[in-house]
Amino acid sequence: MATLPLSLIFAFKNRPKCVITRAQYVKVMAWQEVTAKRSNELGSPTRRKSSIQELVFLEDDVQALNEAFPQGEKADTSWAVTVLFYLAKLVFGILGLALSIIWLLHIIVFMLVNPPAFPFLNQVFIQLDSAWGLLGTTAFAIFCYYLIMSVISGEMHSIHPMKYQGTLMNSFLFNVAIILLCSTR
């Protein structure tokens, strides 16, 4: 339950702070071009595997560079959207951290202690439902959705990391099995 909020907060912390100059952009692109050419020279199978890893890191670097140096006619708008996107990540990271702490408190107070010390979230949802019929259900849905998103975030980071057009089918099926296992009950 910690990976989702912490990854959002760290994404804000490691965001591009300002737009880089054209000279810096050209310098970094030249370095990335040299790295790409070097990784194209395939040799032994171990070299191929390290080349694939280098290409994945290179793609990440190119994406980070494109965020730091927006191009095109609407470069200012693109930079503003990038800044707002990282601020939204910070806000959702802080909210997620609060939800994680609440879930952990509920697990400790209600589930680990026998008999339960206090019906923490159960009582909160009942009180919200008595205030307005759909409020308790909505809060419960938000908490459940957050748990599923935490599972998805955690398994994408550690067990079998998933990348767009870079995940093997067996890794994808393993991740789907974990999500289905966590969503049943």
From Swiss-Prot:
Bilayer-spanning residue ranges: 90-110, 132-152, 164-184
InterPro entries: LMBR1-like_membr_prot (IPR006876)
GO cellular component, one term: plasma membrane
Subcellular location per the Swiss-Prot or TrEMBL entry: Cell membrane
Keyword Membrane: yes
Membrane topology: Multi-pass membrane protein
Extracellular side: 111-131, 185
Cytoplasmic side: 1-89, 153-163
Keyword RNA-binding: no
Family the UniProt entry places it in: Belongs to the Casparian strip membrane proteins (CASP) family.
Complexes and interactors: Homodimer and heterodimers.
Protein name: CASP-like protein SELMODRAFT_413556
UniProt organism field: Selaginella moellendorffii (Spikemoss)
